[in-house]
Amino acid sequence: MVKVIASSVRKGNVLDVDGKLYVVLTAQNFHPGKGTPVTQVDMRRISDGVKVSERYRTTEQVERAFVEDREHTFLYEDGEGFHFMNPETYDQLVMSTEDIGDLKAYLQEGMAVMLSIHEGLAIAIDLPRHVTLEIVETEPVVKGQTASSSYKPAVLSNGVRTLVPPHIQAGTRVVIATEDGSYVERAKD
C-alpha cells in the first residue's frame, strides 16, 4: 500500500479504506469560498459492488492499493461472466457483469484490453479509446435542415444509441469513443 494525498486520487485508482478495496469512479477537487479545499471521491467497493461517496481534505492521506495493469485479450461472455486471457502466459481471468458495467457494449471478441489486477483478481478494465462499429439504423437526411443541430440519432451494431453527422447512413462503419459513446469519425477500412 502507498499513502498519497487525496487531491492526487484519480478515476480508476484502487483505494484501501478500513481494510476494504474500492475502485474510484470519480474524483473532484472543490475549493469553497470559505474553508479548506476538499476532494469528493465516488467509489465502488470491489467485494460487493456497493457505491460509496467520501469527502477528504485535499491534503489528507489515503492508502492506494498496489494494482498491476496487464494487457489481456477478451475471449467470450457466458453465464459465469466475461473471460479474458493473458497473451503471454495464457492464464484466464473472469470478470462479472457488475465489474464490467456499461463497457460491456463495446467489448469485441479478440479485443486487447488492460485489466487492473490485485492479488490475482481482475478488479477493473480499461478499453481501447476507440472501437469501430456499424450503423444499423438511422434517420434519412432531410434536405435544407441546417437551422437545427447538425447531428442525427443512430443505432450501432452493439445496440448503443449515438449521434452522427447527417451524411452517415445505415451500413456505414464508424469509429466510436468508448468513454462516452460519441461519434469520432467514419472508419477508414
Swiss-Prot record:
Protein name, UniProt field: Elongation factor P
Keywords recorded for this protein, A-Z: Cytoplasm, Elongation factor, Protein biosynthesis
Taxonomy of the source species: Bacteria, Pseudomonadati, Pseudomonadota, Alphaproteobacteria, Hyphomicrobiales
Record organism: Sinorhizobium medicae (strain WSM419)
Pathway involvement of the protein, from the record: Protein biosynthesis; polypeptide chain elongation
PANTHER family: ELONGATION FACTOR P, TRANSLATION ELONGATION FACTOR KOW-LIKE DOMAIN-CONTAINING PROTEIN
GO molecular function: translation elongation factor activity
Gene of this entry: efp
Family indicated by similarity: Belongs to the elongation factor P family.
Record flagged with keyword Protein biosynthesis: yes
PROSITE patterns per UniProt: EFP
